[in-house]
Amino acid sequence: DALEPGSNVLMSFDYSPGTKPEIQPMAIAMLKQLFRGNHKVFLMALWPDGKFMSKDALKEVLKEYPDKVYGVDYVNLGYKPGGEIIINQLAKDNDLSVLFPADLTGLSINSIPIVRDLNSKDPDLSILQRFDFVISLSAGSVGTKEWILFGTDPAGVDFTSGCTSIQVTGLLPYADNNQQMEGIVAGLVGAAYYEKLMDYRGMARKSLPAQTYAHIAIVLFIVLGNLIYFIEKKDES
């Protein structure tokens, strides 16, 4: 919300269908917030399946924002292999077309208005430094940690992450005092809170009760198993 309207924001979709239930809801919520703020959104992926995750998220969000124009308000750069090497190049190089000669649809990158506007910024700035904010939607490596270590921290760019719940404890040190990361959205619970802040009932808020009941059932089965074990042990004695 603190970003000025028209800010350039880079979103990296670094996850696969296996973690889609956790991360896709937060991706959709973030895209909605960015479109609501009239920001310029650049999507990319460091995981092969990430390009499909970004397409699905966009398809969902554009139902609410049909006035957003491809190439003007947002662009999908697609998947780029190379992991942390790509992140490092984004932090050092100043020509986006070297890394992404074309977008996901095959359009020449330099023919896209939103990219030309980005390239018109101070030529002394790296590609990453031309962005006002960077977001990693991460299910592991390559993901949030690599973006911090090889990209946003060295480049001095504001950054946040949406990640799986299993990752969050390992990433919290980077968020201490907002030194290297502006907070974390973690797992389905984090996505549900995000949807609540955005004042809509999305996939996370709809799925959370089912997850809660499943966790309760697991705990009950564990307790029941222990009770049966102790009863049988007592009978044997």
PLM regions and their residue ranges:
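Short extracytoplasmic
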Residues: D1-P25
